[in-house]
Every structure is written in C-alpha cells, then in structure tokens.
Amino acid sequence: MRQTLACLSAPALLVAATALSGCMQTGDGFDEPPAMRWDHRPEAAEWTQAAISALASDGAVLATTVPADIETFCPNYAEASLEERQAFWSGLFSALAQFESTWNPKASGGGGAWIGLLQIAPSTARAYSCDATSTSGLKDGAANLSCAVKIAARQVPRDNAIVDNGAPGWEGLARDWAPMRSSTKVKAMAAWTSKQSYCVKPGSRA
C-alpha cells in the first residue's frame, strides 16, 4: 500500500483521498465511524468530518507520509489503507485537543494568544494561509481543525516525524503544539491512538 500511495500523482491522490473520505463518512470503510477522543461531544460528527475533509485536500500529504516514529502512535500505519491513515491523523488531533483545550472550541489561552480546539494563534493561522485567521474564526471547531491539518501537513513531512526523528530539538507537531513536547502527554495520546481499530495490526485485533 505504501508503494501504491507513493506512486500517485498529486491530482490522483486528491481524487482518491476525497473518494475514500466520502466512504468513511458514510461508514463504507468501517463497521462504524472511526473512534475519536471527542466522540462524547455534540459536535463530534462535524469535527470528524472537517478533519477528514481537510486530510483529503490541504493535508493529503499526511496520509502518504510514514513518519520515523509512527510505530509508537499507530503500529499498523505502514500497511494501512489511505482511509485508515486519515482516521489515524484525525484521531491524533482529537487526542491532542484534549490537552490543548479539553475539546472546548471557544477556549482562549495565553491571555488570548491561542485560540480554539488546537489553540492556534491568529498570526500562525495567517502564516499558514488558513481560511480562519481571526479569533472568532478560530473558535469555530471545524475551521480550527482544518487549520491544524494545514500546519501539520507542513511540519510532519518536513521532519519526517510526529515528534521525534532522532535529531535534536522539537520536530513535527512538537514545533507548534506544546503537549507534543511532554513525554507524559505524548505517551497518553499514543496509548489511545495505537489501540484504535485503524491502528491495530490485523493479527492483534480482538
């Protein structure tokens, strides 16, 4: 599967990713919608759809990237389908949102410097050409997630890492999100994502 994904041209990848994300939203690829850490929230379906849609467009590169430290977060990722990889990235953002905002889309941290589900600064949103660049815009959960995917799509391939490729300094998502610099929080996030159906190796599934 890795070779197939790697050989797709950018337009073909976008078409494939969009088609597969549509299957996920209707449940065609899973017996039930893929699990997210925010599933207890009333906005859960909207947020998951927003994340998957962003991963099929601006963030399509994430599902074709195999980070050096992916085994920690998603043991089956290297062999996973494009759809399962998208589910993983969405799941990881849902886990990160717990530590950034406790899933509160209106959260404001750092004296108003960081906004929303993933605590994104308006200046950062502008730097990454996100659709939402204002405080009010970033308090929309779906828009905040779409922006987060754009940021990740730049940083993860740049370092070939979610948080660690063996080089010194902050890498991947740790460049922009403080919880990814905490070994305790990273361990908690990885413990959750790695046991989800889209990350468990087939032979290990119950």
Language model features: what each stretch is:
Residues G112-D131:
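Substrate-binding/active-site groove segments that recognize
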